[in-house]
C-alpha cells in the first residue's frame, strides 16, 4: 500500500484476504504514527508491516503480486498550509510519473497495480503507464449518483495487453441512499451499511 496514510487501505486489504501479507509505506510522520496505532490494535497486525519511508527509497528483496495506491490527487493546485495535509493531497513528493516507474519496478511479472484517481489524472496515468509496459486491465468509472459523470476511476494496470474490462459503479442513488452494488462492495468494512 503506497502512501498508506492512517493505514485504512492496508487494513481493508488484510481484512479482505486472509492470506495476504501487506507492506504499507508512509512518509508523513503523524500519519505514520496513526497507521502504526491502527495496525497494532487490529486483528491483522501480524500480517501488515509499516515502513516509514518514501517509495523512491524502498527497495525490498521481493516483488509484489498486488500494489495498491490511493495517491495524492492534486497536480496543479495550491498546497494546503498544513504540511501533512499537503503531502497527502498533492503530488509534490510523489508525482504520478514516479508512481508508475516505481510500481513497475516492484511488480512481479503477473502483478497488478491498482489505483484510484480523478478521471483526468487517471487518463494521464494510463497514457504514461504504457511507456513502462503497464496496461489497463480493469477500469471502473465511479459515479457519485445516477446521471452524473464519473468523478473517479478505479484502475488495475498489468503487463498484459488484453482489452480492459470496463464497468461502472454508482455510489448513491440519492443523498445517503447507497446503491446495492456499492453496499455489496463495502458492507464488510462498515459497522452500519444499508
Protein language model features and the residues they cover:
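SAM/dcSAM-binding transferase cores
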Residues: 148-194
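Mobile active-site "lid"/loop adjacent to the S-adenosyl-L-methionine
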Residues: 71-98
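Conserved SAM/SAH cofactor-binding pocket of Class I
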Residues: 1-81
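Phosphate/oxyanion-binding loops and surfaces in catalytic or ligand/nucleic-acid-binding neighborhoods
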Residues: 74, 132, 160
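Conserved Class I SAM-dependent methyltransferase catalytic core
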Residues: 94-150
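Short, well-ordered secondary-structure micro-motifs
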Residues: 61-62, 79, 125-127, 152
Amino acid at each position: 500500500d503506497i502512501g498508506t496514510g492512517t493505514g485504512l487501505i492496508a487494513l481493508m486489504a488484510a481484512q479482505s484476504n486472509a492470506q495476504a501479507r501487506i507492506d504499507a509505506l508512509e512518509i508523513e510522520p503523524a500519519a505514520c504514527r496513526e497507521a502504526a496505532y491502527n495496525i497494532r490494535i487490529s486483528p491483522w497486525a501480524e500480517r501488515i508491516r509499516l515502513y516509514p519511508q518514501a517509495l523512491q527509497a524502498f527497495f525490498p528483496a521481493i516483488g509484489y503480486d498486488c500494489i495498491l495506491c490511493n495517491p495524492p490527487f492534486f497536480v496543479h493546485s495550491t498546497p494546503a498550509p498544513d504540511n501533512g495535509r499537503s503531502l497527502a493531497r498533492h503530488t509534490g513528493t510523489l508525482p504520478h510519473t514516479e508512481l508508475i516507474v516505481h510500481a513497475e519496478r516492484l511488480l512481479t511479472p503477473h502483478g497488478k497495480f491498482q489505483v484510484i484517481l480523478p478521471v483526468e489524472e487517471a487518463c494521464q496515468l494510463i497514457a504514461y503507464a504504457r511507456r513502462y509496459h503497464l496496461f489497463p486491465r480493469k477500469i471502473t468509472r465511479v459515479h457519485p449518483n445516477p446521471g452524473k459523470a464519473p468523478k473517479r476511476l478505479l484502475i488495475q494496470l498489468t503487463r498484459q495487453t488484453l482489452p480492459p474490462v470496463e464497468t461502472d459503479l454508482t455510489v448513491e442513488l440519492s443523498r445517503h441512499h447507497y446503491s446495492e452494488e456499492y453496499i455489496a462492495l463495502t458492507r464488510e468494512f462498515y459497522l452500519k451499511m444499508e
